Amino acid sequence: MFTVLLVDDDPDVLELTRIFLERDPDLIIDSCSSAKEALQKLNHKIYNVIVSDYVMPEINGIQLLKTLKFQGIETPFIIFTGHGNDQLAKEVLNSGATFYLEKSENPRFQFAKLRKMIHDIALKQRREEHYREQNICVVIPAHNEEKLIGTTLDSIPDYIFRIYVVDDASTDRTPEIIREFAQKDARIFPIRHETNQGVGASIASGYQKALNEGMDIAVVMAGDNQMDPAYLPDFLDPIINKHVDYTVGNRLQNFEYRKGMPQIRVIGNALLTLLTKIASGYWQLMDPQNGYTAITRRALERINPSTIYPRYGYCNDILVKLNTYGFRAKNINHTSRYNIGESSGIRYRSYIFRLSKLLLKDFLWRLKEKYIITNFHPLVFFYLFGVISIMLSVILGLYSLFLKIAFDDSILTRATLSILLLFMGLHFVFFAMFFDMEQERNNGR
């Protein structure tokens, strides 16, 4: 059951609101006619939500809300008023109210909206209680994030059991700020790298600590406050409900995000997404460079944090390992916060080249581990024959071109054979990719 305290000095409105809300069997309604009476009740009883009028004698709705905040009472609070305007709405929400609702001439509509707000709060509270039953941690890699690390730590929800902040040899005030927050919040556990090891190594350190302390789920969020904690339930629910083992963010559904990206980054992101699909075998995933992720303890133990690539590219490396060992992954659409003082340490030209080499190495390792050693699949031959055919096609084509230029020799026969080899090679490769896609679909069932 969900308990609601109504506060309104108008007895008719109070009674009408009570009657309407009591039609919902999940709600238990209590009421009082003044803020003073509400404060007395709150000294003896805990409610799940408070619905208060704004204009009341002696103490108005906002003053009641501020008094409760001062007393440390964080009960969700809805201002329900007939004296509304945009300025008041802004003041109410800035004061910490959960929702703001104006009374209208259509009682059925306004009470239905009020009930929906109450149900949204109830759902959120039940969700958070469910999360508290799990040992959920957040790993935050931080390198020279003095501007935003404090804001990031402040935003972590209460249902997160542990926060591992990994300082990767920062040279600014980042370590000092982390220590200050750790003194105020017992959930925060600082980890310090004396030498810069890379963002992948920082996350691996956090993952290892999470395993050592028995965490059930480990979430990764950047230290620059770009990753909105409001999306955490979307990342956690598929894992808690045992639908997947790994969730990874997808910003590419957001048009504003794509619109604001430099052209070189758009092209680079598209190329790396394609290469990661091929290398990892997760053909349905988008935005593999996204660092906003959540992973189960079981998956984390299997991939072994110490084997994670230490620099940028770690997220692609993790995907390859997860697919190789048969874990399910899912994209979570979300928006990110930009232009808040963050800065990127990625040099995209060198990053794309370096990551392409890593993906080739990981791809060959996955084929060996997954389709030769663990469970043999003929797609390995398709890839092999495809690559050999394409290479022979290129060599034969170049040789024919050389003969034509050097000796004016006829190239028709050789060119035809080269083209046939090319098409045959592409067919082999595409069939191999198709079989790989089918493996992913079967793994997701």
PLM segments and residue spans:
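Acceptor/aglycone-binding surface of glycosyltransferases and processive sugar-polymer synthases
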Residues: 189, 193-212, 217, 229-312, ...
